């Protein structure tokens, strides 16, 4: 595959863009972002980057708390570790995250990538009201050894509360059958929500085993490095110090004022420039070991950019095809984990690496991101 676009520092973005017109468009966008100080304005919570409407600017500025999450939640690591150890010591063997969208997708990424940590809980994510999906989530689990995590920013998410009601009934029946003297299934439930009315809206909130209150200025799909992601991480046995250190390392790199040196800004500006050039579909090609990040990215990208009749259409889990199968409207992002098995080859035996090389040669932009360890997913939560 040809060399990456030279405008970017090697550790910022590996972008293979053979089409000269697309390369020029990206370079022009980088120059504009630098001239208009996009990076500094983002970290200053300057809503004028996105809108000229003062009301919209204020709303946006009040939703940028995710910029502080890696630092703010570092102080919570001892308490989170104690919580995880306490749940394990209490005899819990599994946990179910009952949430939708942003409240469930980051936990799903972590539950899949760290599912083999010996001695810790099995974590499953319930984010579909399909009865078959609900039964699958509970299949094989002991209701009396399963912690239910009710995750809802608003406290009124219909699906999350429906999952809670279903879990309540299952646990109540199991308690009666076992002759247990616990007064309430609430002993086996916790909540992750916002303070105030959000908490008050959750049924049985005053009797739950524990409640974790998230910052109000963090939107659901940006909450991976808040309690939404960190509470499940504590139950999976993830090294929280290392996890947040990875996020802080990436956050520090995203303070580089020059877009060419900034992993987050380089990615965002590139995708924006390519979208303006007609590349409005992003196909993620991830190693199976980190494939669940695709669902998280789908929601993050689609819900964040899909406004006012425009946006990038993310595509995850689609088998990679030959170059001739695609119109000139695609961007491909390869997410690889060192030492992990790559995506399966095509029935004809063509590997993902060979297909991506052919796609780049045919003029499709190919961006490559490599993780040294699953713990580096924390950095990707920041970068994207």
Please state what every model-predicted region is:
Residues 173-333, 338, 362, 376, ...:
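Active-site phosphate/pyrophosphate-binding segments
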Residues 65-85, 108-151, 156, 163, ...:
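Glycine-rich oxoanion-binding loops at beta->alpha junctions
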Residues 95-110, 222-229, 380:
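Conserved phosphate/anionic-ligand binding catalytic regions in large, soluble enzymes, centered on
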Residues 60, 79-93, 137-146, 270-279:
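Glycine-rich phosphate/diphosphate-binding loops that line cofactor/substrate pockets in enzymes
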Residues 1-89, 339, 346-350, 354-357, ...:
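Extended, charge-enriched "interface" segments that sit outside catalytic cores
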Residues 68-70, 93-99, 147-154, 190, ...:
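Short glycine-rich or small-residue beta-strand-to-loop segments that form or flank ligand, phosphate
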Residues 110-122, 170, 300-311:
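Short helix-loop-beta junction
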Residues 157-164, 343-347:
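Glycine/threonine-rich flexible loop motifs
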């Amino acid at each position: 595959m040809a060399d990456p676009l030279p405008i970017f520092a090697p550790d910022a973005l590996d972008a293979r863009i053979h089409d000269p017109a697309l390369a020029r468009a990206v370079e022009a966008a980088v120059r504009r972002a630098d001239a208009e100080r996009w990076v500094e304005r983002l970290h200053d919570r300057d809503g004028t980057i996105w809108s000229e409407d003062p009301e919209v600017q204020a709303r946006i500025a009040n939703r940028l708390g995710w910029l502080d999450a890696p630092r703010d939640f570092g102080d919570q690591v001892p308490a989170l570790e104690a919580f995880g150890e306490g749940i394990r010591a209490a005899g819990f063997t599994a946990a179910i995250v009952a949430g939708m969208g942003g409240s469930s997708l980051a936990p799903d990424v972590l539950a899949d990538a760290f599912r083999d940590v010996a001695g810790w809980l099995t974590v499953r994510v319930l984010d579909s009201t399909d009865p078959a999906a609900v039964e699958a989530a509970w299949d094989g689990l002991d209701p009396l050894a399963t912690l239910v995590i009710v995750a809802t920013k608003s406290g009124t998410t219909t699906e999350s509360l429906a999952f809670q009601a279903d879990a309540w009934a299952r646990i109540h029946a199991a308690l009666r059958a076992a002759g247990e003297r616990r007064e309430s299934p609430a002993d086996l439930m916790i909540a992750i929500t916002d303070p105030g009315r959000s908490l008050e809206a959750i049924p049985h909130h005053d009797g739950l085993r524990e409640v974790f209150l998230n910052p109000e200025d963090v939107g659901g799909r940006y909450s991976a490095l808040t309690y939404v992601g960190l509470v499940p991480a504590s139950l999976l046995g993830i090294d929280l110090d290392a996890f947040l250190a990875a996020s802080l390392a990436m956050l520090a790199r995203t303070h580089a004022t020059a877009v060419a040196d900034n992993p987050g800004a380089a990615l965002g500006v590139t995708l924006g420039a390519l979208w303006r050039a007609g590349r409005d579909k992003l196909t993620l090609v991830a190693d199976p070991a980190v494939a669940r990040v695709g669902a998280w990215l789908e929601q993050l990208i689609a819900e964040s950019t899909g406004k006012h009749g425009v946006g990038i259409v993310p595509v995850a889990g689609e088998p990679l095809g030959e170059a001739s199968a695609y119109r000139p409207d695609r961007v491909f992002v390869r997410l690889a984990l060192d030492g992990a098995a790559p995506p399966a080859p095509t029935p004809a035996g063509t590997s993902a690496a060979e297909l991506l090389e052919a796609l780049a040669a045919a003029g499709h932009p190919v961006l490559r991101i490599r993780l040294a360890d699953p713990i580096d997913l924390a950095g990707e939560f920041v970068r994207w």
